[in-house]
Amino acid sequence: YRPYHLRSIGEYSLSKVSLDDRDLPRPMKDGNRVKAYYAYDVVSGAVVGYAYNRYKTTELFLDCMRNMFQTLDRNGMYIPAELEVEHHLVSDFADGLMQAGTVFPLIRWCNPGNSREKRAEHKNREKKYGVEKRTQVGIGRWYAKLEANRPKEEKVYDEKNNTYKVKTYSYEELVADDIRAIETFNAQPHPNQKRYPGMSRWDVLCAHQNPNLAPWDKAVLYRFIGQHTETTIRQNTYCTVMYNQYGLPSPEIIEKLEPRNYKVDAYYLPDADGTINEVYIYQNGRYIATCKPVARYNENTAEQTEYDKAAYTEQSKYVAQFDKMMKDGKIKRVGILAKEEAKLITEVQAEAVPLPAQAEEEDYSAYMDISAFEHDAVAKI
């Protein structure tokens, strides 16, 4: 047997998150299997991110990352210090999202074909032969050494003598069952009860976070994993994303835009319920601003609530700031150039301007020969 490394698990959660993909063991009605991608916290063992797809593509990995950061954001957690991944599905992001220091401080690329190395491989087995085997039908491997780990199969006695009845499920059923299994898995007692008495995997994740973790910059992160759309700044005030308006934080942001160019790229990540709380806008790869939803107010004064009054005040402040910038000349009004002036400008011919000749550098090579100085110094002794 080839020697392998002996390691110990750390002390703090989110110090390292290990990711891996797998096929759910039970087949769909077309005979194929659902592709799943998990993110496990190494210390607590809890699943902090998951995603499903009918196909094993890079979008499966991105969906898992989105789900993980939604979980971290929802629970007020900081960015993991290290990610452990394999080259499969992830290598396309090696120069961006998966480059150490861009989003995550550390990235661990596992060696291909070495399943011992990746912690998520062990967690997949622990989840499959633990909670899944107890709560789902048909979990196991027909060639498993232990009979308890073999699925129960009903044989069909025909001329082939190799036919078995296999129950199939819909895609939605398999995904729902696996999400329930994840919730049960996270709620189970932590395997090391001597170290974490009475605590579940999720309890350890929340209570023992690494104190050196840093908050994450959504403006940078969402550019890699967020949803993207092209939009336009309207009325020097807002942009529209998914049929909703998101306002600029200040009229001064307009100065960051290129002249006469109001087209921007918007990046965002909806919550679990589909709500978009923030939109991060870029122009030609340069960050411009973070936009929040524009609060509309009821124009019927008799029906206005405190919310409507606050929304009216907020919009009025923005307009007042814009008017002040116009008055101060920071934003120029659009003017019309006279035809004569425009014609003169277009007829101007570019002329080459001669550059003054550069003076030759002085020759200091004579000063580099120190033998003459040594001779004079000796003569004076």
Task: Describe the predicted segments one by one.
Residues V42, Y52-T57:
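A short acidic/small-residue loop/turn micro-motif
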Residues D41-V42, Y282:
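Short, acidic, Ser/Thr-enriched surface-loop or helix-capping motifs
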